[in-house]
Amino acid sequence: MTASGDDRGRAEAPSELRRAGAPLSTDAIDSYVDAHTTPLEPLLQENREETYASLSSPQMIAGPVVGRLLRLLVSLAAPRLVLEIGTFTGYSALAMAGGLPPDGRIVTCELSPERAAFAQGYFDRSPWADRIDVRVGPALDTVEALDGPFDFVFIDADKDGYTGYYEAVVPKLSPRGVIAVDNTLNGGDVVDPVDERDRVMAAFNDHVHADERTENVLLSVRDGVTLIRLAG
């Protein structure tokens, strides 16, 4: 059976996009990925909707695909101690909390008292309220005060601080611990940096990749997620 003209057009669309140099993360592909990813609890959807409705820079939220990825990674790692740097409105902490083992807990760091209070309201309504500890203040101070070891770390905060956060947590990472870092593609602009944020993120990626203490993979999931563990 031969395909109709319309069918051929649909079949060739992805390759045509690639030949034209269009970015992979188109709206259509994003929608397809969303539709084929297991959704998280309704409370997280409510959190996301309220974040977009009431806060500035709502795009900083991790979102359902990265949230499900974090849930899966935490479920596989079965961490006793999770460290999150950058609570924002609590979406990613809630996503990770759902994958914790019975003895697992999360310490999440947020500089803004207002955002921390917003997130706490959702934590209190969740089944994991007693397992999420919000620390308000500079994240480096919190990391310094914690003994570790960290079994899972999620970094999604001020991009200028990424290298400092990385250096602070690597010595406190458990032997099988994993670090996940969000936004490491920075909209694709790390490939050919133009502004300061581009250069900061590109420098962070170079720093991690050159670090002989660790090994990493940069995944092209949404805005880029880098997974890191100790080498050897």
Can you describe what each PLM-predicted range is?
Residues M1-F152, K159-A180, T184-G232:
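A short alpha-helical cap/connector motif
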